[in-house]
A protein has these predicted regions:
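Extracellular hydrolytic enzyme modules, especially secreted metalloproteases
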Residues: 1-109, 119-122
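A detector of low-complexity, intrinsically disordered, Ser/Thr/Gly/Pro/Ala-rich segments
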Residues: 23, 39-41, 46, 149, ...
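A broad, structure-centric signal for solvent-exposed, well-ordered loop/edge residues
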Residues: 39, 104, 123, 219-225, ...
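Hydrophobic beta-strand residues in large extracellular and virion-surface proteins
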Residues: 69-71, 86, 116, 140, ...
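Extracellular low-complexity, Gly/Ser/Thr-rich intrinsically disordered linkers
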Residues: 76-204
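Pro/Thr/Ser/Gly-rich low-complexity, intrinsically disordered linker/stalk tracts
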Residues: 204-232
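Extracellular low-complexity, O-glycosylation-prone stalks/linkers
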Residues: 232-240
Length: 240
């Protein structure tokens, strides 16, 4: 409880429904919600990546270009600031990605994996401590698409439902309040030994591009084709 209340002193709002509307909120994932009661209030969870972003403790890496991402758990020493952000056309609305595992202060979480937060910052809601009432302004995208406190283990990706993608077209999907299509798909989500990997916008081309060089030994019956070697390639298919 002290950690929760002191976090208010540092500026964080409550994430539970403060008007008791019954709205489904982040629950045990956050110290500012039911997480303050984890392990009979003895082991509150780590501050989320969004909460640490608010404190100025981390600056999440923005995902813009196609890439392959590897994420260590935030509970690992030295990786407390391993987080990513996907922005929308509204500077106050974005998505925060973090890897949560049942270790350290996160030992009593109900689930583990890639947790995706949908943030829509509205100053008046923050000032009135009404962030998560009728609409969720600090929300977890439930991978299994179930808003149920009995299925929290399915909230993270891939989770119990083995959900490996989050795109404009999946359910649940990237669904910003702006109504736009983000064209920022997260695919191939995997969790192996607590490490999360995924591809953003299809992933990076790890092999590189083939660069053709001028042909040599040009004769009536043929020529020698030339190109720069491609890293890790074991063969090439040439169409003439």
């Amino acid at each position: 409880v002290f950690c929760h209340e002191f976090s208010h002193v540092r500026g964080l709002p409550d994430l539970y429904s403060t008007n008791y509307s019954g709205a489904f909120t982040p629950g045990t994932w956050s110290l500012m919600d039911q997480g303050s009661y984890n392990s009979a209030s003895r082991t509150p969870p780590l501050h989320t990546a969004y909460e640490r972003y608010c404190f100025g403790w981390l600056e999440p890496t923005e995902l813009k270009d196609p890439c392959n991402v590897t994420m260590r758990p935030i509970s690992d020493i030295g990786f407390y600031d391993d987080a990513y952000i996907i922005k929308t056309s509204n500077p106050y609305e974005y998505y925060i990605l973090e890897n949560r595992q049942k270790a350290g202060w996160d030992k009593y979480l109900k689930g583990h994996g890639l947790l995706v937060w949908h943030i829509n910052f509205v100053p008046d809601m923050w000032n009135m401590n009404l962030c998560n009432v009728s609409k969720q302004h600090i929300d977890v995208i439930e991978a299994d698409n179930k808003k149920d406190y009995y299925t929290v283990e399915g909230d993270a990706f891939p989770g119990t439902a083995n959900v490996t993608a989050l795109t404009d077209d999946t359910t649940p999907g990237m669904d910003p309040w702006t109504g736009e299509k983000l064209h920022a798909p997260i695919t191939g989500i995997k969790e192996i030994d607590g490490i999360i990997t995924f591809m953003f916008k299809g992933g990076a081309n790890i092999f590189g591009e083939i660069v053709a060089n001028p042909a040599t030994d040009i004769k009536a019956g043929g020529f020698t084709a030339n190109w720069n070697a491609v890293n890790m390639a074991t063969g090439y298919l040439l169409s003439v």
